[in-house]
């Protein structure tokens, strides 16, 4: 068939000449063609169509033709393939086809189709498929049973015919009896196990030949026993049992010669059996005498006296039952002969009709007690051969039983508990089968996507009903804890602790901080030099004291302080600008001042007015002093080498030192006394000390205590900054305390009366000379060093151990700072 997709209608049209109106095969030749097409088909569509064609065909000849040409074997191959692939629809179709075919036992033996179907009926996961397989198995079992029963029945018929021919001289029976026996035989094979008991009956019939002489002897004795009511069977049977043994002995002797005559028939027991049931009239009398010994044996097992009476009336009323009972008893009457007892178990005729013969076969040895067997005989007769059942009640104390169970809340019920081993085995088999099929199915799985992925729709979940941590007190405790504990920083994953608990406290010994002296031990001065007490030059503008200035204004005010004009005499325009910037805000923060919309415009205007003032207005001073250039705001002016500075009153001091007042003492380094401090950036520092002013010899000067009485004069330059560790002269203007050599009492200084010197030396007024010290040790490389290479130690560490003796450039120390 083609490799492309197949249209079922086209396929059926191609088979139109073979098929009838209902889709069935019309002729035998057509079935052969269908079989050839089935062998070549590989697609599921083709196979299903062909299976349906076979299902629609109902002619037994055509179906038999299909089986003969090999259709049954082909279905076996398809069944194996479908079971391997776990194709349930195909399996269902194949099972229906197998159920439709007229299979025989020989066909079922050809391959393992029956075995596969039986496995499907037990282990299939599909419930419908399992039921269908079970029905098919039951149908096949019925076929097997019917055929196996028919075959032995035919064989028995042949044997019976031969036996009847051989036994005809012994028996005077007519051919009608044989035909009746054969009819009985035909009926008996339907019940498989009735054949053996029928033989036992026939044995009893063999005894029936001479039963006429036995009948008159035993009839009178058992009849009165049977006529008695049910309540008095025990004594009657005991009486009857006494004469019975005497009668039974001659009867047994008579039976023996009868049995001996047809010894050949004994050897072939089956042959003797058929004629005996016909002669039931005379045989009943013999049975009445025979059952007593047989029943004795049974009674040994069950000694029940009260019900024995009921047995006798039933015996007389039902001759057929009596005959069945006599058959086992007849062989027993001969206690000395064991051969008869051996024959008894082989005659289970009553076993089918009555369950007694099983008991009869077991108890043959105990024959001595004769009274008990008679009672048992009566009991069995009353029950029609059924076992006696008794009803009893327990004692009153045991009528009620109470069971107390305590509730265990922790107890768990195992719902999946397996009830029995059968269920466990079935589950295990299903699991193994599923695992095997999965392994085979996934062995060639290429893991390709078969079902396309579809993005699931979004779920609209309701909002949280409870706000997490809304009433939590732990978060406040955690916040308080974090306020007193430093944050732990982990630089690597290995340093992260396993648990979030607090780290172990580190053990350390607190040590007092080291005190680093700012002066040498030999220095005698203590404390910081107090600021000047002159409050005459307080700034006039309240805005300079009232608020913190922004950095721009602070630099501006610092430049104004270093300008040639007095700081307290501001131009009107500048005063108005400052008042407009700061007056309205009061004590506002600098950030708020800078947020004003026209802040930048006001600053530009202020700077412009200040520049014009510096250019057009010369500083007051002696004649010959020229005007200075624009003020450097926030940066020291470039140093001048080999330049003789003008007198201190007219030289513009560096930005680190405000110029002295017109009439007052030299102002402090932080601006005019009493004025706002920090009006500009502090002077550059080096290792925590003020930078020495440029253009100085660092050897004392006019501020160092005068000329020392003609010794070292006052041409040493400006004083060192405060707290600078040099050995210059100590004295000078009142705001500075330097170290230098105290001069002798010289001429009075320019600022007032003589100062006090150390060691009979006097300095200028207000300067206490501290004699006895050598010259300044830090000089040697003065002036601007910016032309030299930068000191790498100073750039890396921020300091240099050579300090001012270093031959390299220290930005901001021995030269201007870096841009």
Curated annotation (Swiss-Prot):
Q: Which InterPro entries match?
A: TFIIS/CRSP70_N_sub (IPR003617), TFIIS/LEDGF_dom_sf (IPR035441), TFIIS_N (IPR017923), Znf_CCCH (IPR000571)
Q: Where is this region: Disordered?
A: 151-204, 296-391, 495-785
Q: Using the record's annotation, list all stretches that form the TFIIS N-terminal domain.
A: 73-147
UniProt-recorded Gene Ontology molecular function terms: enzyme-substrate adaptor activity; protein phosphatase 1 binding; protein phosphatase inhibitor activity; protein phosphatase regulator activity; zinc ion binding
Q: Name one GO cellular component term.
A: nucleus
Locations of Basic and acidic residues compositional bias?
Answer: 153-165, 173-190, 495-504, 589-604, 704-715, 758-777
Q: Which GO terms describe its biological process?
A: negative regulation of transcription elongation by RNA polymerase II; positive regulation of termination of RNA polymerase II transcription, poly(A)-coupled; positive regulation of transcription elongation by RNA polymerase II; RNA polymerase II promoter clearance
Write out the entry's keywords from A to Z.
Chromosome, Metal-binding, Nucleus, Zinc, Zinc-finger
According to the lineage, what is the superkingdom?
Eukaryota
Q: Where can the motif PP1-binding motif be found?
A: 386-415
Q: Which Gene3D superfamilies match?
A: Conserved domain common to transcription factors TFIIS, elongin A, CRSP70
> Where is this gene product found?
Nucleus; Chromosome
Where composition is biased (Pro residues), the residues are 635-663, 670-695
Q: Which SMART domains match?
A: TFS2N, ZnF_C3H1
Name one matching Pfam family.
zf-CCCH
Q: Which residue intervals are annotated with compositional bias (Low complexity) in the record?
A: 606-618
Q: What are the Polar residues biased-composition ranges?
A: 305-327, 533-543, 560-578
**Stretches annotated zinc finger (C3H1-type):** 785-813
Query: In terms of one coarse class, where is the protein primarily found?
Result: nucleus
Q: What does this protein do?
A: Substrate-recognition component of the PNUTS-PP1 protein phosphatase complex, a protein phosphatase 1 (PP1) complex that promotes RNA polymerase II transcription pause-release, allowing transcription elongation. Promoter-proximal pausing by RNA polymerase II is a transcription halt following transcription initiation but prior to elongation, which acts as a checkpoint to control that transcripts are favorably configured for transcriptional elongation.
Q: What is known of its domains?
A: The TFIIS N-terminal domain specifically recognizes disordered sequences in protein substrates that are then dephosphorylated by PPP1CA (or PPP1CB or PPP1CC).
Summarize subunit and interaction data from the UniProt record for this chain. Component of the PNUTS-PP1 complex (also named PTW/PP1 complex).
Protein known as: Serine/threonine-protein phosphatase 1 regulatory subunit 10
């Amino acid at each position: 068939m083609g490799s492309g997709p197949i249209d079922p209608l086209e396929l059926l049209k191609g088979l139109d000449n073979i098929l009838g109106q209902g889709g069935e095969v019309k002729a035998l030749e057509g079935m052969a063609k269908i079989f050839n097409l089935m062998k070549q088909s590989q697609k599921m569509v083709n196979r299903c169509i062909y299976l349906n064609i076979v299902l629609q065909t109902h002619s037994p000849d055509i179906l038999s033709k299909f089986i003969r040409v090999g259709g049954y074997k082909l279905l076996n191959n398809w069944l194996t393939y479908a079971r391997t692939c776990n194709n349930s629809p195909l399996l269902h179709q194949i099972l229906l086809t197998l159920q439709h075919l007229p299979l025989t036992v020989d066909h079922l033996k050809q391959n393992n189709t029956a075995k596969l179907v039986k496995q499907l009926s037990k282990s299939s996961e599909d419930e419908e498929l399992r039921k269908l397989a079970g029905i098919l198995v039951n149908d096949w079992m019925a076929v097997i049973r019917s055929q196996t029963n028919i075959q032995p029945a035919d064989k028995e018929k042949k044997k019976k015919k031969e036996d009847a021919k051989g036994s005809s001289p012994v028996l005077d029976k007519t051919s009608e009896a044989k035909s009746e026996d054969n009819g009985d035989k035909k009926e008996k094979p339907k019940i498989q196990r009735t054949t053996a008991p029928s033989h036992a009956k026939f044995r009893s019939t063999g005894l029936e030949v001479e039963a006429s002489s036995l009948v008159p002897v035993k009839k009178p004795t058992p009849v009165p026993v049977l006529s008695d009511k049910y309540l008095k069977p025990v004594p009657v049977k005991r009486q009857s049992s006494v004469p019975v043994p005497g009668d039974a002995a001659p009867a047994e002797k008579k039976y023996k010669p009868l049995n001996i005559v047809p010894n050949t028939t004994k050897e072939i027991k089956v042959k003797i059996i058929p004629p005996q049931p016909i002669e039931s009239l005379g045989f009943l009398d013999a049975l009445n005498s025979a059952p007593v010994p047989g029943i004795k044996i049974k009674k040994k097992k069950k000694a029940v006296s009260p019900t024995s009476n009921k047995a006798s009336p039933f015996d007389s009323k039902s001759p057929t039952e009596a005959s069945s009972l006599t058959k086992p008893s007849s062989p027993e009457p001969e206690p000395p002969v064991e051969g008869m007892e051996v024959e008894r178990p082989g005659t289970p005729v009553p076993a089918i009709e009555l369950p007694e013969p099983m008991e009869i076969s077991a108890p043959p040895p105990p024959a001595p007690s004769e009274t008990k067997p008679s009672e048992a005989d009566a009991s069995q007769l009353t029950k029609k051969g059924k076992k006696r059942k008794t009803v009893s009640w327990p004692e009153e104390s045991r009528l009620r039983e109470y069971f107390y169970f305590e509730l265990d809340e922790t107890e768990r019920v195992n719902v999946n508990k397996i009830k029995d081993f059968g269920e466990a085995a079935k589950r295990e088999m299903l699991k193994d089968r599923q695992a095997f099929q999965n392994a085979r199915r996934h062995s060639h799985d290429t893991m390709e996507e078969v079902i396309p992925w579809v993005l699931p729709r979004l779920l609209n979940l309701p909002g949280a009903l409870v706000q997490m941590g809304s009433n939590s007190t732990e978060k406040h405790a955690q916040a308080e804890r974090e306020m007193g504990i430093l944050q732990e920083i982990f630089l690597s994953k290995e340093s992260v602790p396993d648990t979030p608990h607090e780290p172990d406290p580190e053990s350390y010994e607190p040590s007092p901080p080291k005190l680093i002296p700012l002066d040498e031990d030999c220095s005698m001065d203590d404390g910081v030099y107090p600021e000047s007490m002159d409050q005459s030059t307080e700034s006039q503008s309240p805005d300079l004291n009232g608020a913190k200035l922004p950095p721009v204004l602070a630099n501006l005010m610092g430049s104004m302080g270093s300008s040639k004009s007095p700081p307290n005499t501001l131009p009107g325009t500048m005063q108005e600008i400052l008042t407009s910037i700061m007056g309205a805000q009061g004590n506002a923060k600098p950030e708020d001042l800078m947020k004003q919309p026209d802040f930048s415009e006001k600053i530009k205007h202020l700077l412009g007015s200040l520049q014009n003032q510096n250019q057009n207005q010369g500083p007051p001073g002696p004649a010959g002093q020229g005007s200075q250039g624009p003020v450097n705001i926030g940066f020291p002016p470039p140093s001048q080498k080999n330049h003789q500075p003008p007198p201190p009153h007219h030289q513009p001091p560096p930005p680190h030192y405000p110029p002295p007042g017109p009439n007052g003492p030299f102002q402090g380094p932080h601006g005019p006394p009493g004025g706002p401090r920090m009006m500009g950036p502090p002077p550059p520092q080096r290792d925590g000390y003020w930078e020495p002013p440029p253009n100085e010899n660092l050897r004392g000067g006019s501020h160092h205590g005068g000329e020392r009485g003609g010794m070292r004069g006052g041409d040493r330059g400006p004083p060192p900054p405060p707290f600078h560790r040099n050995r210059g002269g100590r004295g000078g203007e009142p705001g500075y305390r330097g170290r230098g050599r105290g001069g002798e009492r010289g001429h009075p200084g320019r600022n007032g009366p003589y100062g006090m010197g150390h060691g009979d030396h006097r300095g200028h007024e207000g300067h206490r000379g501290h004699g006895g010290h050598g010259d300044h040790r830090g000089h040697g490389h003065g002036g601007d060093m910016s032309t030299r290479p930068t000191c790498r130690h100073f750039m890396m560490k921020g300091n240099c151990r050579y300090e001012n003796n270093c031959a390299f450039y220290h930005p901001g120390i021995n030269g201007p700072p870096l841009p």
